[in-house]
């Protein structure tokens, strides 16, 4: 399971008359202090102070005590005062009444962190009928038991879409201890931070790159990571397009992060002229065998049994008609079908395909992503450009 046990410190501070006078377990709202990565939560006559502002403290599973060895719970490790002292000072600055109370109880509590911060739900790709419901925090807790129970019963969750938490989403490169620990260390202090939607990871980059990577770097490519793959978002070499199309930066600084007007210029130029698009990150699979076309037809909504050389774009649905994926399927031979899907869904789609394959050995599955690459030449002038490189008829 791609996760690492990570410490979240919490201390119970009290007693305080102002809290005891409420005569309730919770009489005041929870306070979330985004600047210091702390929260304060009433617990009867005490205040619980939790922090994500301390250094990342990760533990190997072998370091976690057994039920017999643990003083109270295996998830409660010995408290490290030095890590919490700065957090306590900021909490007192926010609520000075805390300075007159004492720490009654404190722990280094363990929670699970994954490489992309999402839970690990579903049947494991490695072991059939071994199910995971791990790295579920309070924010995901409600409904997760129902979702996983439905998944185990029907083969897919029915109550909500949890594809972003499907454990099959991870590629091999994301399952190594080095990757899991690096991502947990980088993300921990952002748990209570304000993270830009397009913000990129700093560590563990260039795990998978296309064959044009060095040339793209020469052109000043700005890469975003899609799971393990690096994809260029815009090229510094195209900066002249900003002036050509009269473009400018966005007014708000936040909106300019992880963005450039160059990408708009490239889009406009592609619509008027043409452009080359790197599609190396797309995942490519092949089904072969006497049952390949029949099985592919069963997977897809659209008809896959088309003339050889034709391709289709199609959804994949579950038996309730719920949406699983959308992708391209190509009939390459009488008994051969190619599947091309997006990098973010590649792991899930591969597992779905393997999980539902016929058991009579009439179909074989092969992942050929790293054997092929794809470039798209798009735009109204694409045929004219390509005609300079080939004598093939491009009318179709």
Label each PLM-derived region with a short phrase.
Residues 35-36, 44, 55-62, 66-208:
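C-terminal catalytic lobe of FAD-dependent flavoproteins
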Residues 19-25, 99-105, 308-313:
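Short Pro/Gly-enriched beta-strand edge/turn motifs at strand-loop
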Residues 10-12, 30, 39, 120, ...:
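Conserved hydrophobic/aromatic beta-strand scaffold that supports enzyme active sites
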Residues 1-27, 159:
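Central helical "cap/lid" subdomain
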Residues 19-50:
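Conserved FAD-binding catalytic core of PHBH/FMO-like flavoproteins
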Residues 42, 123-125, 329-333:
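Short, low-complexity Ser/Thr-rich regulatory SLiMs
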């Amino acid at each position: 399971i791609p996760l690492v046990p990570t410490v979240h410190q919490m201390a119970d501070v009290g007693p305080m008359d102002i809290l005891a006078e409420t005569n309730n377990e919770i009489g005041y709202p929870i306070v979330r202090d985004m600047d210091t990565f702390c929260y304060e939560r009433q617990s009867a006559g005490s205040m619980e102070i939790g922090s994500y502002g301390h250094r990342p403290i990760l533990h190997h599973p072998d370091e976690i005590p057994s039920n017999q060895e643990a003083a109270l719970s295996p998830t409660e490790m010995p408290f490290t005062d030095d890590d919490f002292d700065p957090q306590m000072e900021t909490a007192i600055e926010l609520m000075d009444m805390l300075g007159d109370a004492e720490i009654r109880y404190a722990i280094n509590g363990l929670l699970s962190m994954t490489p992309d911060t999402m839970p690990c739900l579903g049947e494991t790709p490695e072991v059939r009928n071994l199910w995971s419901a791990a790295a579920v925090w309070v924010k995901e807790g409600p409904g997760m038991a129902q979702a996983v129970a439905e998944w185990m019963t029907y083969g897919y969750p029915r109550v909500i879409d949890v594809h972003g938490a499907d454990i099959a989403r991870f590629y091999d490169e994301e399952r190594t201890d080095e990757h899991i620990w690096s991502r947990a260390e980088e993300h921990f202090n952002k748990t209570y931070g304000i993270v830009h939607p397009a913000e990129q990871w700093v560590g563990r980059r260039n795990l998978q790159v296309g064959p044009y990577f060095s040339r793209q770097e020469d052109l000043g490519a700005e890469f975003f990571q899609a799971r393990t793959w690096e994809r260029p978002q815009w090229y510094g070499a195209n900066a002249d397009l900003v002036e050509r199309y009269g473009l400018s930066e966005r007014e708000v600084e936040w909106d300019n992060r992880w963005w450039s007007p160059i990408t708009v210029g490239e889009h406009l130029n592609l619509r008027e002229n043409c452009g080359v698009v790197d599609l190396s990150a797309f995942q490519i699979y092949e089904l072969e065998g006497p049952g390949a076309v029949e099985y592919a037809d069963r997977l897809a909504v659209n008809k896959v049994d088309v003339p050889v050389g034709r391709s289709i774009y199609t959804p994949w649905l579950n038996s309730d008609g719920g949406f699983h994926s959308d992708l391209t399927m190509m009939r390459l031979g009488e008994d051969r079908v190619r599947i091309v899907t997006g990098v973010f869904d590649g792991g899930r789609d591969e597992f779905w395909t393997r999980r539902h394959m016929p058991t009579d050995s009439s179909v074989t599955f092969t992942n050929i992503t790293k054997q092929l690459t794809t470039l798209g030449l798009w735009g109204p002038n694409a045929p004219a450009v390509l005609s300079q490189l080939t004598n093939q008829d491009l009318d179709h």
